[in-house]
Amino acid sequence: MNRIIPLWSEIAPYTQESPEQAQPSVKEFAVPGSRGAVVVCPGGGYEFKAPYEGDPIAEMLNRAGISAYVLDYRVKPCHCLAPLSDASRAIRVVRSLGYEKVGILGFSAGGNLCCSAATHYDAGNPDSPDPIERLSSRPDAFMPCYAVVSLCQYTHIGSRNSLLGAHANEMPFVRFFSAEQNVTPDTPPAFIWHTSTDEAVPVENSLLLATALAKNAVPFELHIFPI
């Protein structure tokens, strides 16, 4: 039985838009003795979470000896910071379980969430009464898979609209969730892949991210497949 771990002991922040999504969680796929873990973010355009990008991916990571935690994050009608707060909290929660390294992986819109977690993080609040909030939310690595990296150009408009809601055409919000515009030299290393013929999420998304990482001397590996 895979344990379901709530991210918060009480109602999660930013829940006013969707009380039925008040308790996001991670589903545990632990490998005994594993020193590293990956938070898995399924795609779905910020409207749903695709099942085939969740549990099967965790099981694949398990076969490689890596523990995995599938994130049940909030989607439309929750907007903007709600999904990101879930991803950041998930990294802290998984880190609290004793893993030496915690990465984050995401597909399509889940890849956008993965990239946001890798570019908007903090070291934790040492004065927080919640011990989990004292931990860093910076992933040790991130793995965007055919990700909606940018909400500015070459974007998947459905993901942009579902994530930002009424703010979908406000550039400060658009830029904040466009990872290529938020990379710094402290951004964690990345493993990026895409297909050159992707019609839903253009390959330029991954190319923009790789370019930004290169300019900031952040280690990355990029794979573009022809199909």
PLM segments and residue spans:
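N-terminal cap/lid segment of alpha/beta-hydrolase-fold proteins
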Residues: 1-33, 80, 157
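Mobile cap/lid helix-loop segments that gate and shape the active-site cleft of serine hydrolases
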Residues: 10, 147-182, 188
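Short beta-strand element of the alpha/beta-hydrolase
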Residues: 35-43
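Catalytic nucleophile-loop/oxyanion-hole region of alpha/beta-hydrolase
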Residues: 49-51, 56, 69-101
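Primarily recognizes the serine-hydrolase "nucleophile elbow" in alpha/beta-hydrolase
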Residues: 89-158, 174
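Short beta-strand/loop motif that positions the catalytic acidic residue
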Residues: 186, 192-194, 198
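Conserved alpha/beta-hydrolase "acid-adjacent" motif
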Residues: 199-208
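Catalytic histidine neighborhood in serine/cysteine hydrolases
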Residues: 214-227
